[in-house]
Amino acid sequence: MRSNGCGDLRKEHIDNSVQLCGWVDRRRDHGGVIFIDLRDRTGTVQITVDPDLGAEAFAVAEHLRSETVLQISGKVRARPAESLNEKLATGAVEVLASGITVLNSVKGNLPFPVSVHDEENTREELRLRHRYLDLRRKRMNDNLRLRAQTIQAARRFLEDEGFIEVETPVLTRSTPEGARDYVLPSRVCGGEWFALPQSPQLFKQLLMVGGIERYYQVARCFRDEDLRADRQPEFTQLDIEMSFMDQEEILQLNESLICSIWKAVKGIDLPRPFPRMTWHDAMERYGTDRPDTRYGMELTNVSDIVKDMGFKVFSGAVKNGGAVKCIAVPGGNEALSNVRIKPGGDVFSEAQKAGAGGLAFIRVRDGGEIDTIGAIKDNLSDEQKQELLSRTGAEPGTLLLFGAGDTATVNKALDRVRQYLAKELGMVKADRDNDQWNFLWVVDFPMFEFNSDENRYEALHHPFCAPNAEDLGSDASQWADTLPGARAQAYDLVLNGLELGGGSLRIHDSALQRQVLQTVGLPLEEAQEQFGFLMDALDVGAPPHGGLAFGVDRMVMLLAGEESIRDTIAFPKTQQARCLMTNAPGGVADKQLEELHVASTWVDPTEEDSN
């Protein structure tokens, strides 16, 4: 049907007869001559329709609408000097049309414009409802091509390193670790259920036991959890596992993988090695285990300086086992008014959203003088003031913002405020303009975290991470005193404040695996019922192994400079886990439920209220 792509035509094609297919991007009538911008996946080219040289083609062109599908026959010629378009790859040529065939027309009005010339801030809900049309937009088309490039580059690298792609089951069984499962009833095995995998975690470990040694998969994963901009109920992981490699070797190989992807997709040579930071240092300095290191404003712990001062908000927080931390905002005196920091202000609101009661502040003036509320100023000695300024490195013009309370809340609040101010004050570029790629390995994660509501320990990542041998010995009866500080051989790769991927060395000894499962509250009988197949596998000569998984959707979001992963997925769900285009999820016939031995107990709240 076509001889060339619209965006492929160049000066070397002048005088060639061509056939093109595509959509009408724009149509312009310039008093007797009609110009059509014809668009396909390769780009856009100008079509000139002259009634003196093609009367039938002109008659068709007079009535064309945007997004009409055309086949055009014509000859490539040079554009007149006055109409050259340097913004287009095809801007030096045009096609003089001799024939136009309408392959399909547009019925009714388009829900939103597609042409790059007419792009507007269309509501996302409307875009998702008509996703097939939204995908024609250059931005979306480019994102999907970039996604394909990213996966292709990863496959090429891994296969060159001796990895093989193996598919693992999508229908599996529900296990108690991780987030909530999506479950599916079995028709054949009445009363029993499959679960969709949250990750291929156990299967890839079994592949290592099976001697595969180097595995990867572009895996579909499913989690029934509350959603946000960078999460979806179904998502894609680049899943990797390998045997006979220690943590250092795994980190090195995956740095090489990331560098290979960035080179292939962005043409960038990333500096190596990537910096590393322990989980403890990340939490202390940034308040988060995924710090954005493109800018400063690190958290400074000043608990020891203010623990005895008369300002009870500070001293009380330390007395109750919490912390007082602050961030130093350079130029903050001029950039941030008191109104923005106090209740009702935008900066105050950011802290409040993270659970903080508010923010205290100190403005550093010329000569090291400070300006703050009386309750702080009156209770801060000269020695404490000088120590604060020294520890924070605050120069005149700096604004110090303080959080006080339990350490977790202080960290969360100041982390949120820090990220907010970095954007507000121009310390980082907008996503689409970003040219900083600050990678960071976060290592030495805690093995466990304590769940105070259930009065038990839980695995911070998952219960298959190998513990650091220095922290947990082989005798589980001696673990009680070391659990709070026990580290896992786990690692995350962070990019510009977002987790790009994470993994660990795995437990490959069945006795240790049972001990860890018991520690996180899974009795031996239940552990055997849920994970007996894994224990059996570990008992037949399981090799030392480890790996990690990268979030493909998030990786592509960062490479594309998008704010949401929904703009890097062909057919995403909303934050309510709905597909607006197909209206999924939807109801099913009673007969289907009967065949599955399932009865619905759902009651529509609107109907219940009306009764």
From Swiss-Prot:
The keyword Transmembrane helix does not apply. The record marks H30 as: Important for tRNA non-discrimination. L-aspartate binds at E177, R223, H461, R506. Its EC number is 6.1.1.23. Residues 201-204 are annotated as: Aspartate. Disulfide bonds: none annotated. One of its GO terms (cellular component) is cytoplasm. Belongs to the class-II aminoacyl-tRNA synthetase family. Type 1 subfamily. Aspartyl-tRNA synthetase with relaxed tRNA specificity since it is able to aspartylate not only its cognate tRNA(Asp) but also tRNA(Asn). Reaction proceeds in two steps: L-aspartate is first activated by ATP to form Asp-AMP and then transferred to the acceptor end of tRNA(Asp/Asn). This is Aspartate--tRNA(Asp/Asn) ligase.
